Amino acid sequence: MNPLKAGDIAPKFSLPDQDGEQVNLTDFQGQRVLVYFYPKAMTPGCTVQACGLRDNMDELKKAGVDVLGISTDKPEKLSRFAEKELLNFTLLSDEDHQVCEQFGVWGEKSFMGKTYDGIHRISFLIDADGKIEHVFDDFKTSNHHDVVLNWLKEHA
């Protein structure tokens, strides 16, 4: 696993959202976007992380940042997740983990003694020109939003 770094050009992608509509990274050209990768919708850690972003969306918008969450869940599951948690941002389905691999977040993980391939919880702030401005890879699900907002304030 080799995640992209600040300064790299973000891979262009097109993925279905929670409503089955195609969303392209190029739709956000001229804007900053936080692309956050998370392992699985409707699980405890991922729910805490998503709700933290939801509850701080006004602050993120003030900083000029849109949010896209990416997992390998099917759009139908993402739709249920968004409805259940009243999420106010777009969730994208990368079922074949191609985009995860392009960003370098797909790789070997271990949980309770088992080793498997999956998504590593990493977020990328992409600038208005499509370049990775910052990589967030050191946070807890409960403070992800704080880590992002603090970085945005320090680099305003």
Curated annotation (Swiss-Prot):
<dbReference type="InterPro" id="IPR050924">
    <property type="entry name" value="Peroxiredoxin_BCP/PrxQ"/>
</dbReference>
<keyword id="KW-0049">Antioxidant</keyword>
<dbReference type="GO" id="GO:0008379">
    <property type="term" value="F:thioredoxin peroxidase activity"/>
</dbReference>
<dbReference type="Pfam" id="PF00578">
    <property type="entry name" value="AhpC-TSA"/>
</dbReference>
<keyword id="KW-1015">Disulfide bond</keyword>
<dbReference type="InterPro" id="IPR036249">
    <property type="entry name" value="Thioredoxin-like_sf"/>
</dbReference>
<dbReference type="InterPro" id="IPR024706">
    <property type="entry name" value="Peroxiredoxin_AhpC-typ"/>
</dbReference>
<dbReference type="InterPro" id="IPR013766">
    <property type="entry name" value="Thioredoxin_domain"/>
</dbReference>
<dbReference type="GO" id="GO:0045454">
    <property type="term" value="P:cell redox homeostasis"/>
</dbReference>
<dbReference type="GO" id="GO:0034599">
    <property type="term" value="P:cellular response to oxidative stress"/>
</dbReference>
<protein>
    <recommendedName>
        <fullName>Peroxiredoxin Bcp</fullName>
        <ecNumber>1.11.1.24</ecNumber>
    </recommendedName>
</protein>
<feature type="disulfide bond" description="Redox-active">
    <location>
        <begin position="46"/>
        <end position="51"/>
    </location>
</feature>
<comment type="function">
    <text>Thiol-specific peroxidase that catalyzes the reduction of hydrogen peroxide and organic hydroperoxides to water and alcohols, respectively. Plays a role in cell protection against oxidative stress by detoxifying peroxides and as sensor of hydrogen peroxide-mediated signaling events.</text>
</comment>
<keyword id="KW-0560">Oxidoreductase</keyword>
<dbReference type="InterPro" id="IPR000866">
    <property type="entry name" value="AhpC/TSA"/>
</dbReference>
<dbReference type="GO" id="GO:0006979">
    <property type="term" value="P:response to oxidative stress"/>
</dbReference>
<dbReference type="GO" id="GO:0005829">
    <property type="term" value="C:cytosol"/>
</dbReference>
<feature type="domain" description="Thioredoxin">
    <location>
        <begin position="4"/>
        <end position="156"/>
    </location>
</feature>
<comment type="subunit">
    <text>Monomer.</text>
</comment>
<dbReference type="GO" id="GO:0005737">
    <property type="term" value="C:cytoplasm"/>
</dbReference>
<comment type="similarity">
    <text>Belongs to the peroxiredoxin family. BCP/PrxQ subfamily.</text>
</comment>
<keyword id="KW-0575">Peroxidase</keyword>
<keyword id="KW-0676">Redox-active center</keyword>
<dbReference type="GO" id="GO:0032843">
    <property type="term" value="F:hydroperoxide reductase activity"/>
</dbReference>
<feature type="active site" description="Cysteine sulfenic acid (-SOH) intermediate">
    <location>
        <position position="46"/>
    </location>
</feature>
